């Protein structure tokens, strides 16, 4: 699902280790870090150096969701730092991959692991929380969760982006405080949003990011900054 809860066609990469016939493998869901080009999405980059492929060489069945906004869903804004759609991309891929394994006769040993780095660390924690809240059958197989270097404190992450904008635009940057932007006009709000997004996205990015993570921070919407 996207940030509005609407169903979208999503994609990802499944990497299967070479083992003797009938051998069973643990399942590892790997959530990738922040990327800015669709060609870097796992399903578009199935090469030997891709992290998920390397992990599969260690004996895991590795699932690597592209995330909404990449792969089959390119064109849909990527829900960066929005926990619900981020978690859904991982949990839905877990379910789809389980169905595929049954159809392809790829045996797993009933063990599930979650890991991710950078944005993938955030997505991993969001997915773990979603599994706990739903009581999903995947939770019964979950053995370990290892998130790494993620922007778990979204407030702090956004404060870092604000500092980058303040360095570039000190006058406008002085006005950027959570909750204060509501008192500015629409043009000022759009400019602040543009500057914050530019601080994150490189100029050659070929995907779009949903700006709600910025809007919620600027609105001081603590309930959703998580």
Language-model regions: role of each:
Residues 1-26:
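N-terminal cap/lid segment of alpha/beta-hydrolase-fold proteins
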Residues 3, 43-47, 77-85, 115-119:
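Alpha-helix capping and helix-loop boundary segments enriched in small/acidic/polar residues
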Residues 15, 30-34, 65-68, 115-119, ...:
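Active-site-proximal beta-strand/loop segments in catalytic clefts of secreted hydrolases
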Residues 19-25, 33-64, 68-74:
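Short substrate-entry loop that stabilizes the transition state in hydrolases
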Residues 23-27, 57-63, 108-112, 140-144:
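Loop/turn elements at helix/coil->beta-strand transitions in domains of secreted/extracellular proteins
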Residues 80-103:
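Alpha/beta-hydrolase active-site loop
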Residues 96-168:
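Primarily recognizes the serine-hydrolase "nucleophile elbow" in alpha/beta-hydrolase
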Residues 148-226:
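Accessory cap/linker subdomain of secreted extracellular hydrolases
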